[in-house]
């Protein structure tokens, strides 16, 4: 199963968005008010891992490793590959892309699940 979401951020440079992706405080901000616990987060560079728990009729654990990190002046791309997955999932790949768009930035999330 595949899912793609695109988010346009106006009047913000792509590099400002990229800096946010590298900030642990930004990750905490994204999960604020959600039933999510960040267990560990090492960063988004290649081979760095992240693990967290989220509430869905009980706490569920998920762990990923980051791969295929690409960064240049106005572009970022990296993937989360599932290590520990909930709900019997066999595979999880989440590709993050940040690139210029009109007077701002475009964030593209491409998620592929294997059941």
Task: Please describe what each predicted stretch is.
Residues 82-115:
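Beta-strand/loop substructures that line and gate deep hydrophobic ligand-binding cavities in soluble
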Residues 34, 62, 103:
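Residue-level signal for beta-strand positions within conserved beta-sheet cores that form or flank
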Residues 1-6, 75, 91-93, 106-108:
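Intrinsic-disorder/low-complexity, polar/charged segments enriched in Ser/Thr/Lys/Arg/Asp/Glu/Gln
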Residues 8-13, 55-57, 99, 112-114:
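Solvent-exposed residues in well-ordered beta-strands and their adjoining turns
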Residues 25-29, 38-86:
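Glycine-rich portal/gate segments that line the openings of hydrophobic small-molecule binding cavities
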Residues 1-48:
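Hydrophobic ligand-binding cavity/cleft-lining segments
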Residues 5-7, 62-70, 93-100, 111:
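Hydrophobic/aromatic beta-strand elements that line small-molecule binding cavities or substrate pockets
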Residues 11-15, 43, 68-75, 97-108:
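A short, structured loop/turn motif at beta-sheet edges
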């Amino acid at each position: 199963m595949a899912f793609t979401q695109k988010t346009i951020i106006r009047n913000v440079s792509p590099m400002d968005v990229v800096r946010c992706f590298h900030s642990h405080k930004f990750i905490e901000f994204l999960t604020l008010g959600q039933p999510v616990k960040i267990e560990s987060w090492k960063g988004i560079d290649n081979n760095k891992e992240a693990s967290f728990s989220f509430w869905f009729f009980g706490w569920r654990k998920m762990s990923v490793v980051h791969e295929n990190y690409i960064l240049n002046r106005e572009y970022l791309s990296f993937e989360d590959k599932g290590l520990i997955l909930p709900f019997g999932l066999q595979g999880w790949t989440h590709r993050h892309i940040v690139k210029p768009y009109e007077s701002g930035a475009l964030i593209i999330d491409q998620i592929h699940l294997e059941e």
